[in-house]
Curated annotation (Swiss-Prot):
Annotated Polar residues bias: 442-460, 520-539
Domain of life: Eukaryota
Coiled-coil stretches noted in the UniProt entry, renumbered to this chain: 469-496
The protein's name: Protein HIR1
InterPro entries: CAF1B_HIR1_beta-prop, HIR1-like, HIRA-like_C, HIRA_B_motif, WD40/YVTN_repeat-like_dom_sf, WD40_repeat_dom_sf, WD40_rpt
Keyword terms: Chromatin regulator, Coiled coil, Nucleus, Repeat, Repressor, Transcription, Transcription regulation, WD repeat
Species per Swiss-Prot/TrEMBL record: Chaetomium globosum (strain ATCC 6205 / CBS 148.51 / DSM 1962 / NBRC 6347 / NRRL 1970) (Soil fungus)
GO MF, one example: nucleosome binding
Listed GO biological process terms: chromatin remodeling; DNA-templated transcription; regulation of DNA-templated transcription
GO cellular component entries: chromatin; HIR complex; nucleus
Length: 1080
């Protein structure tokens, strides 16, 4: 062990040495940053420090110094990627510095003894958000956020990409003096003078996150107070540290009885059973070494089972001027260094290799303690560190070096797409737009307009030709300026009679162009249509044809599961107890004239109420033998349904339905006596269009611009054309219909025995055989009871989409879709995802923006600047009607079902209880990766549902969200499988037969070899996924191969440009053959 304390390593002044409050090492270990009472941040060369005893060492000692604060600087921290340096001071400001590659423009400061700067660190941002001194700073391990704490009791979260303020957390009751991050990137902890440590759970925000997006992020997980109940309030800092394996937090300024100590807090349980005792005064700071250590020297051929145990090393220091170093293998300190400074120790910093410790003191000195190999142990590899973090669902993914030049090129393209998405979203929020002519191409995010007529990128027309096109834009600007001048000159008379110019709202005076660079402005048309998280189409579901009762249609089941055998005699007692004492209530009575409705019994007051319905429908005998029984609608005297613009509206009165003259009103009247026929008619503007009579009472009606339908209480369904001509013979069903829906030429009918029928009136065929609702009503887990049927979840709605697929929702929140190809129900939404998934009821806004600005196949351009291959081209002879018809199929169904699940979930009042159960579950051993696993599974469920439904827009959106998540999680196996499935038959030569392609050109499912998947070309989907995965360096060895096929690498772009200029090249074909050999 060597202690290095150079005399020049200090913050020197003219009369004294200033206090050093903070120190930190850069991720590459080459720089030491210190902050002191002189208001300077100084950057030192660690190589010069290690060679301080060599007088012939000619390297510069101080690399740079920055004095952009107005007071004492309390904290300085490098970002984990080494790109930024942050400092916080008592002037309430946080400065973000960035290293400029250009040499410094100035020499030594005039009138001082400061050496000339070697590096050029420039102020990148100044963050203002605290009301008092900024006491400590910390970066998340993925650089996504920066958190600052201060004497104003606030915890402020800043974006690590845009440095916007994301959230201000005020949960501490006193000064906050310490902050540390979980290396698994799940939590961060803050320590304050209220004698509490607060643990916050967070999800790393995307690069374009805003304060509005983070409302439900950064949630307080727990509060720890036991080790600090009588801790002194005299310490300047309470700097805590998280162990590199994620298991423990070391908290400074704790007490164990009357003795000062360092509390070791265990993860998950969040309690402190271990205390490091040895300091004679309160501790200010403790710091874990960033590396794990082996207690024994590992052999070169040691297996995982035979490798020695791993330990962590921690250093602590405080007001007793003593530096102690511990490891988890011994109960006593490894080394104690006393009186290493004349005043209190303020901060500690380890080098990335874990072998050298730097310490700063309030006496103005900085020392380095360098250990020899084996003194602390033998440093474990970075892979072993990552392996220790995997049980918590975190690792240092994406922090390695780029795979090669192509990998770096792909990463730059990926980040450019994210940046365009962030700028596009910011432009939408700020209302940026440019006055444009309709004939002028829309420029998105400052990119060049799409080339026309085969022009190559970069070629522009002469300015003389563009002048006439700019005239309308200039006219719009002039009109806007005139309006603003008129608003500014408006005079207002106050109450006391004085005249003054009325104030003008800033937003109303916007001229359409902000004082931002043109690259940050976004076209109004593009921002309005591309920045929504949900597809910009109407919901592809039929509107409910009649109002269902609250809670849905009641359902009863005779289950398949056998109940435990009951004792003899118990069943009879239970049946006797269930019999009503007043006897059965009559529905019909037998009179000489036939069956008549039973008269209503007079109430106690003697007033007979007016019934809302005539009578219950006559129950079909088939329901007695069915295991599933749904409630049958009652027979109403009058049913009125208006048809507005081809869409059937809800039930209303005849006066309300006739208010709109264009409405066609369908009216059904049921007689009071059973022997009289029911009357049905359609009218418009009071004139009857057609009428008809039916021998049975009508209980349900539906219709659209293609046909009308009515269901009777005898189980028959009748259909008419819009002019009143009967389409089909009466369709006889097994029991009374309880739900009747229509969509275009499709008719849905669900009967009281739970059978679902779907008819195509145009082709006079059925979409599939009748299917029972029993499986989705949980009949498999319902016990077979002798006393009678068991209540089941109610059916709250049943819909048809434009291709005749059935979607059913239940009162328990579940949403189902019936697959006519698999002949089975599929659950698309359930409350399970609401509890465990981080994507519930939300989309990744960065992916929504990215899919439309970087890799979108319709409006965006490819990386090489050419138009996207899926941009539809039409000719006068053959318009592209099929493509436009397929865009809206099943649009919005999955978000609709998830919103329904949330509504039912909250309506039942179960949300709070189940959330507490999940929170308790997450704190148990073995469930550390629960949230991450469920979130990935939820995205996979969304993708499968969108693919089955044919929801084109949702499929692409969820696929890109899934690719981003599994890339961030480092799930290499899933990434490789996803890319292989997306490739399909792209690697096969043209003209070769494709297995599974069929004759339609589109192979459904992941394993097909056709060119289409989910309504998109496989090449476009593969390109989008590769661009999203391109920034994850751990996956670049895999993604670069696909990028070469798609021409996203530098060589691929050059070759494609050569092809456009007439040249030929075969590299893509060679790469394709190479990948085919690898797959084999």
């Amino acid at each position: 062990m060597h202690i290095i304390k150079p005399s020049w390593l200090r913050h020197s002044g003219e009369q004294k040495d200033f206090e050093v409050y903070s120190c930190h090492i850069s991720p590459d270990g080459s720089r030491l940053a210190t902050a002191g009472g002189d208001g300077h941040v100084r950057v030192w060369s660690t190589k010069a420090i290690f060679n301080a005893d060599h007088p012939d060492h000619g390297k510069p000692r101080q690399l740079c110094h920055m004095s952009h604060h107005l007071g004492t600087i309390h904290s300085v921290r490098f970002s984990p990627n080494g790109r930024y340096l942050a400092s916080g001071a008592d002037d309430r400001v946080i400065c973000i510095y960035q290293l400029d590659s250009n040499p410094p423009s100035h020499t030594a400061t005039f009138g001082t003894n400061e050496p000339p700067p070697v590096e050029n660190w420039k102020t990148h941002k100044r963050l203002v958000g605290h009301d008092s001194d900024v006491q400590d700073l910390a970066w998340s391990y993925d650089n996504s956020i920066l958190v600052s704490v201060g004497l104003d009791s606030k915890v402020v979260v800043w974006s690590g990409h845009t440095f916007e303020k994301l959230k201000t957390i005020a949960v501490h009751q006193s000064h906050v003096k310490g902050i540390t991050f979980d290396p698994a990137n799940k939590f961060f902890a803050t320590a304050g003078d209220d004698r509490h440590i607060k643990i916050f759970r967070f999800t790393p925000p995307p690069p374009n996150a805003t304060q509005h997006d983070m409302v439900n992020n950064f949630v307080l997980e727990t509060t720890i107070s036991a080790p600090f109940k009588s801790s002194p309030l005299t310490t300047y800092f309470r700097r805590c540290s998280w162990s590199p394996d994620g298991n423990h937090i070391a908290a400074a300024n704790a007490v164990n009885g009357p003795v000062s100590s360092v509390a070791i807090i265990e993860r998950s349980r969040w309690d402190s059973e271990i205390n490091l005792i040895g300091h004679e005064g309160p501790t200010e700071v403790c710091m874990f070494s960033p590396r794990l250590f082996h207690t024994q020297k590992p052999s070169d051929n040691a297996t995982d089972k035979g490798s020695p145990g791993l330990v962590t090393v921690i250093a602590s220091a405080g007001q007793d001027k003593t530096l102690s170093i511990w490891n988890t293998n011994t109960s006593r300190p490894v080394v104690i260094l006393q009186d290493v400074a004349s005043k209190s120790m303020s901060d500690l910093a380890w080098t990335p290799d874990g072998q050298t410790l730097f310490a700063s003191s309030l006496d103005g000195t900085i020392l380095a303690v360098k250990f020899e190999m084996g003194e602390l142990g033998w440093v474990a590899t970075a892979e072993e560190n990552d392996k220790a973090l995997q049980k918590y669902g975190g690792s240092r993914k994406g922090m390695g070096t780029a795979e090669d030049v192509d990998g770096l090129h792909l990463e730059n393209h990926s980040k450019e797409g994210e940046l365009r998405g962030a700028e596009s979203r910011m432009g939408a929020l700020m209302g940026d737009f440019q006055p444009e002519d309709k004939g002028k191409p829309v420029t998105t995010n400052g990119s060049r307009p799409t080339a026309k007529n085969g022009e190559a990128n970069g070629t522009t027309e002469p300015k003389e030709k563009e002048a006439p096109k700019a005239a309308p834009a200039e006219e719009n600007v002039e009109k806007t300026a005139e309006r603003i001048a008129e608003l500014k000159s408006r005079v207002q008379v106050t109450k006391d009679g004085k005249k003054r110019v009325a104030p003008l709202l800033v937003s109303s005076s916007a001229t359409g162009l902000l004082s931002l660079p043109q690259s940050q402005l976004v076209g109004a048309k593009s921002t309005k249509t591309t920045q929504s998280d949900t597809p910009q189409t109407i919901l592809d579901l039929s509107k409910p044809s009649h109002g269902l009762p609250r809670g849905g249609i009641a359902a009863m089941l005779l289950g398949n599961k056998r109940k435990a055998a009951a004792m003899e005699g118990e069943e009879e007692d239970e049946l006797a107890g269930r019999r009503p004492s007043a006897g059965p209530v009559p529905i019909l009575i037998d009179t000489p004239e036939g069956l008549e409705p039973a008269p209503l019994s007079a109430p106690a007051q003697g007033v007979v109420p007016t019934p809302e319905y005539l009578r219950p429908a006559v129950i079909s005998p088939a329901i007695s033998f069915s295991q599933t029984r749904l409630a049958v609608p009652k027979v109403r005297s009058h049913i009125v349904r208006p048809l507005e613009k081809g869409v059937l509206q809800g039930e209303s009165t005849l006066d309300e339905a006739s208010k709109v003259p264009e409405n066609i009103v369908l009216e059904a009247k049921n007689p009071i006596r059973l022997r009289e026929p029911a009357h049905i008619s359609a009218s418009k503007r009071g004139a009857r269009l057609w009428q008809d009579y039916l021998p049975r009472a009508i209980i349900l009606v539906t219709g659209n611009k293609h046909f009308w339908a009515a269901a009777c209480e005898d189980g028959s369904v009748h259909t008419w054309t819009p002019a009143g001509r009967r389409l089909l013979n009466g369709i006889i069903l097994e029991s009374q219909p309880v739900i009747l829906e229509s969509r275009e030429h499709w008719l849905l009918c669900i009967t009281s025995v739970g059978l679902c029928h779907v008819f195509n009136i145009k082709t006079m065929s059925a979409a599939h055989p009748p299917v029972s609702l029993a499986p989705i009503l949980d009949i498999a887990i319902t016990s077979l009871s002798l006393e009678g049927p068991t209540p089941a979840p109610g059916v709250t709605s049943a819909h048809l989409n434009s291709v005749g697929a059935v979607v059913v929702t239940l009162s328990n929140g579940d949403g189902f879709y019936y697959s006519s190809t698999m002949y089975a129900w599929q659950r698309l939404s359930e409350s399970w995802w609401a509890l465990g998934s981080q994507y519930w009821n939300s989309n990744d806004s960065s992916i929504s923006a990215l899919s439309t600005t970087a890799v979108g196949p319709v409006t965006a351009k490819n990386i090489n600047g050419t138009a996207s291959s899926t941009t539809t081209t039409t000719t006068p002879d053959k318009p592209d009607t099929a493509a436009t018809a397929e865009v809206g199929v099943s649009a919005g169904i999955i978000p609709h079902l998830e919103r329904h699940t949330t509504s039912e979930f909250l309506l039942k009042g179960r949300a709070f209880t189940l959330q507490r159960l999940i929170k308790t579950l997450l704190s148990k051993d073995g469930f550390e990766g629960f949230e991450s696993t469920v979130s990935v599974a939820h995205l996979e469920n969304r993708i499968a549902g969108a693919l089955a439904l044919g929801a084109r827009e949702e499929f692409r959106l969820y696929l890109f969200m899934y690719a981003k998540r599994i890339g961030a999680e480092g799930l290499r196996g899933k990434v490789e499988e996803l890319l292989n499935c997306l490739v399909g038959g792209l690697l096969q030569q043209k003209g070769a037969p494709t297995n599974g392609g069929g004759g339609s050109g589109e192979a459904k499912g992941w394993f097909g070899k056709g060119e289409m998947l989910g309504g998109w070309e496989r090449r476009e989907l593969l390109k989008g996924v590769v661009l999203i995965l391109g920034k994850f360096r751990d996956l670049q060895r895999l993604t670069v191969q696909y990028a070469r096929i798609l021409g996203l690498t530098a060589d691929g772009e050059d070759e494609e440009n050569d092809d456009n200029n007439g040249g030929g090249g075969g590299e893509n074909g060679a790469v394709a053959e190479e990948m085919e050999l690898e797959e084999q």
